[in-house]
């Protein structure tokens, strides 16, 4: 199908050579001189085209009949491509190059360059194009996940963010593996400080073989001794796209189905993409449930230990009797009782994770029931604590990010020990220590507790709640994006009201 460009729309204010120069900043943009002197060149995004189509149906016939090419129109009779656009505009080039076309440039002598667009779109890159988001499951919304091939992951991002401003910087990490690492960001939106920080830290890695993106995170972390994840690991495409559009940086690693999004904040690890696919009130409610679940999971066992060891006078009289009765035959102090049950829960969880899926689920359910019942009958623990620990384990599953869930489980143990040794004072000291540590943490140079500390008004409300889209037109100010607004809600409302009239 041959077409002349005849679209009448607002043109980009720049020349085609300048536009091509801008696109060359991305590592997945490729240029090829068919003729060595540069009179006939080919430009394309490797992540959107099929290399076999280019080699077999474009390059091979052109090289065989170079002498017959006098004008760009001669390409029509040479290549075996149906969809060709002659003399495209800059806007055509922007749209089509990002959609799987290649750009052919011809220059004869002192004549001005002429161009043609030829379709070479890739339909499938590799044997498996997308992965299922098993570890970040959502009931509503897309379930497209990354795979272990970084080129396919770049292709997925290109398909969802169709703009030449999406830039990919390719790096090589690992003295033995030469692992391909790609830093993705949106030019004109992402703050350059975040880009430079991520790039510099990746270049400074001196390691023989980084097997996974999570290893890369530990190398470029602001504090490698912190139990908290500094960058947000995600296998979800929509979550990575949102991070880029919001002014963040996404790091892709060849051989890993996970991307690293940053700068990340503590609140980011309790946000699920599903929040934005539900009505804002439902999304806000579920987010608050996650915050409560994380706090309950972290402190419930420690509070039980502190109250029964030092502060039993705080327990209401009606509740004190059942607690004394349930602990009447338990020979251990509350701190050992709590540690025993917490370790048992962790053993069941780890055993279930290492076994095949169906067997692991059975072990977790049956093992929990049998061991819990046997522990109560053997007077190793009380029924009250058994219920509290079971609810604590259940609450930990509400955290949508595996690494943050693991952090909460780890921190439970020192809090229980402090509560058993010093009571409520020890619990407060443990909380203050965690808070002080969080205040000092940074992600790619950005404070980890943002927008809670330093306080950021509407940004804080947006982190704690899922606000309506009409109130979230701006990008997160604490990321310091170059372009503040994602869209103008007032103009959108005016257009909608105009259509209704």
Write out the residue ranges for each language-model feature:
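Membrane-embedded alpha-helical signal segments
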Residues: 1-299, 314-317, 438-501
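Short capping/connector residues at structural and topological boundaries
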Residues: 34, 135, 144, 155, ...
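Interfacial segments of transmembrane alpha-helices in multi-pass membrane proteins
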Residues: 282-312, 328-330, 347-357
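Generic detector of multi-pass transmembrane helix bundles and their immediately adjacent loops
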Residues: 303, 316-324, 331-501
């Amino acid at each position: 199908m041959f077409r002349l460009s005849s679209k009448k729309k607002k043109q980009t204010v720049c020349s085609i050579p300048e536009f091509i120069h801008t696109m060359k900043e991305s590592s997945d943009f490729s240029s090829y001189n068919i003729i060595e002197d540069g009179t006939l060149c080919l430009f394309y995004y490797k992540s959107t085209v099929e290399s076999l189509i280019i080699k077999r149906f474009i390059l091979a016939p052109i090289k065989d009949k170079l002498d017959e090419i006098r004008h760009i129109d001669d390409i029509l009779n040479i290549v075996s491509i149906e969809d060709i656009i002659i003399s495209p505009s800059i806007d055509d080039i922007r749209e089509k190059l990002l959609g799987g076309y290649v750009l052919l440039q011809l220059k004869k002598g002192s004549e001005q360059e002429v161009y043609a667009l030829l379709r070479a779109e890739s339909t499938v890159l590799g044997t498996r194009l997308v992965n299922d988001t098993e570890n970040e499951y959502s009931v509503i919304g897309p379930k497209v996940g990354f795979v272990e091939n970084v080129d396919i992951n770049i292709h997925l991002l290109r398909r969802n963010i169709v703009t030449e401003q999406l830039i990919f910087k390719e790096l090589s990490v690992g003295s033995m593996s030469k692992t391909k690492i790609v830093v993705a960001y949106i030019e004109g939106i992402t703050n350059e400080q975040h880009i430079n920080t991520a790039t510099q830290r990746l270049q400074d890695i001196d390691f023989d073989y980084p097997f996974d993106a999570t290893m890369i995170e530990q190398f470029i972390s602001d504090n490698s001794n912190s139990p908290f994840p500094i960058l947000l690991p995600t296998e979800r495409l929509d979550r990575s796209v949102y991070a880029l559009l919001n002014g963040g940086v996404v790091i892709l690693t060849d051989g890993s189905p996970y991307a690293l999004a940053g700068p990340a904040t503590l609140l980011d690890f309790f946000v699920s993409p599903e929040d934005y696919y539900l009505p804002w009130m439902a999304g806000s409610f579920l987010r608050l449930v996650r915050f409560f679940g994380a706090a309950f999971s972290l402190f419930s066992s420690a509070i039980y230990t502190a109250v029964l060891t030092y502060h039993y006078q705080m327990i209401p009289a009606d509740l004190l009797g059942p607690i004394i009765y349930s602990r009447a035959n338990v020979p251990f102090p509350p701190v050992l009782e709590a540690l025993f049950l917490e370790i048992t829960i962790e053993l069941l969880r780890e055993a279930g994770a290492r076994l095949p899926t169906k067997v692991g689920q059975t072990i977790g359910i049956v093992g929990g029931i049998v061991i819990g019942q046997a522990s109560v009958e053997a007077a190793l623990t009380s029924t009250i604590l058994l219920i509290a620990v079971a609810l604590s384990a259940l609450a930990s599953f509400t955290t949508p990010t595996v690494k943050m869930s693991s952090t909460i489980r780890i921190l439970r143990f020192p809090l229980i020990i402090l509560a058993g040794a010093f009571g409520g004072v020890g619990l407060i000291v443990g909380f203050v220590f965690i808070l002080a540590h969080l205040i000092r943490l940074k992600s790619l140079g950005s404070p980890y507790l943002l927008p809670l500390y330093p306080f950021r008004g509407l940004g804080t409300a947006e982190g704690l709640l899922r606000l309506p889209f009409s109130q979230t037109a701006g990008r997160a100010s604490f990321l310091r994006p170059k372009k503040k607004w994602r869209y103008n809600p007032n103009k959108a409302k005016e257009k909608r009201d105009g259509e209704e009239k």
